[in-house]
Curated annotation (Swiss-Prot):
Its cofactor is NAD(+). GO terms for cellular component: cytoplasm. The keyword S-adenosyl-L-methionine does not apply. GO terms for biological process: L-histidine catabolic process to glutamate and formamide; L-histidine catabolic process to glutamate and formate. The active site is at 406. Belongs to the urocanase family. The gene is hutU. It catalyses: 4-imidazolone-5-propanoate = trans-urocanate + H2O. This is Urocanate hydratase. NAD(+) binds at residues 48-49, 126, 172-174, 192, 197, 238-239, 259-263, 269-270, 318, 488. InterPro entries: Urocanase (IPR055351), Urocanase-like (IPR023637), Urocanase_C (IPR035401), Urocanase_central_sf (IPR038364), Urocanase_CS (IPR023636), Urocanase_N (IPR035400), Urocanase_Rossmann-like (IPR035085), Urocanase_sf (IPR036190).
Amino acid sequence: MAEKRTVSPPAGTERRAKGWIQEAALRMLNNNLHPDVAERPDELIVYGGIGKAARNWECYEAIVDTLLRLENDETLLIQSGKPVAVFRTHPDAPRVLIANSNLVPAWATWDHFHELDKKGLIMYGQMTAGSWIYIGSQGIVQGTYETFAEVARQHFGGTLAGTITLTAGLGGMGGAQPLAVTMNGGVCLAIEVDPARIQRRIDTNYLDTMTDSLDAALEMAKQAKEEKKALSIGLVGNAAEVLPRLVEMGFVPDVLTDQTSAHDPLNGYIPAGLTLDEAAELRARDPKQYIARAKQSIAAHVRAMLAMQKQGAVTFDYGNNIRQVAKDEGVDDAFSFPGFVPAYIRPLFCEGKGPFRWVALSGDPEDIYKTDEVILREFSDNERLCHWIRMAQKRIKFQGLPARICWLGYGERAKFGKIINDMVAKGELKAPIVIGRDHLDSGSVASPNRETEGMKDGSDAIADWPILNALLNAVGGASWVSVHHGGGVGMGYSIHAGMVIVADGTKEAEKRLERVLTTDPGLGVVRHADAGYELAIRTAKEKGIDMPMLK
């Protein structure tokens, strides 16, 4: 049994650590494990199958103790969730450097990872779990909102009103889907095998209602579609069973996607025909049989998606590697539907835009509302962005420390960072602000089945870019920097980097913020310009980014 522990971040203006950066790292580590934030905090699991914040509780305690004693010119090294060393560096160096789940390519398989995991040698960090910047489902909801908004623009005249979106998976990431769809005016029918997860999304205002009856769910969805009413419905069921049944019934949704944890067949996907308890028993008793059955179920799931696509459903992969698993199981046409990045998001990446986020260390929601006003004032010409902030204020329930996310691009991030730092310096905000982002960003990830799928020059699998991103953020003075493997899509399919920087109101922080919040999105523009995207080339030239070989 997992050790029962409750972790929550300290808040307020008093710090226990020797500097605000160390204090911020401590609070954000604990925020990742807050019971309102983490999916399975007793097991240190934050989201995404087995994405963890620390390798085990002993490692967690050692990380906490070390952060409390860490000097302002020292750097703590984290190897797959374990604190392994402290070295004296300098005040502008990162206080923490993190490497999670990284395996030499020929060994980068789930089988080898699980062997090492059993020995206590490694940890799966997902993206923001092991890099201590997860903020609950809000962390993905604007990206999900933007994705569905682009679906609406491309296929439905700019709104999802009068449409049904069918999806599955209501975990930490997938839980954002119902709210994103209803924010775009549509009906969302979301299948989830675990009723507790559905209830959690209802409790946090991401989902409207739940049922265990397919007929009742369809009746509600069709009626709301007819009335052009926004509604989200959580259906208790297994997607590998429900989708084939819907195909038999002749039901075709308007939009179809999936956010189950198909990237990890052992820990993230329940095989068809099993209850949650039966699945847990089989997983422990015979993991190989479990994986085989889960993969067969994933294949059936994708075959049903393909059948619906042929009947007219706008279908896309939402970044969980479900197509690859199905293809490996013999579904030869699994890649007949596109991934969400090339279909809907890449133009934003070309401008250096991505899921920028910030957290109020004070714990006071008023600090976030004041920063919202900064966005509405300083970026008033960006109506999409302002619309998002206004909707977020009304619809987003904070999980753990108050936080906000919005997609800002090159130039915008640095401008925002300076304003926030000035507000901390003047006492307009009660405590420092943590600024970070998802690893899913314009220049920080190599993932051929997701963020870098179908690159114009064929450079999908080149992983130099996230490594350069991490190096650049470290020398620029980010507060903590991370390099992970396997986030989102599983072992062997991605390399990605994260950064977090603290606005503590000091002049030194102002300089670090200007450097990091310029170079971090700047590399995203460079990566896409180098691949030949005209929008990125134009952005690089307009912004004066120095690319020696740019024509």
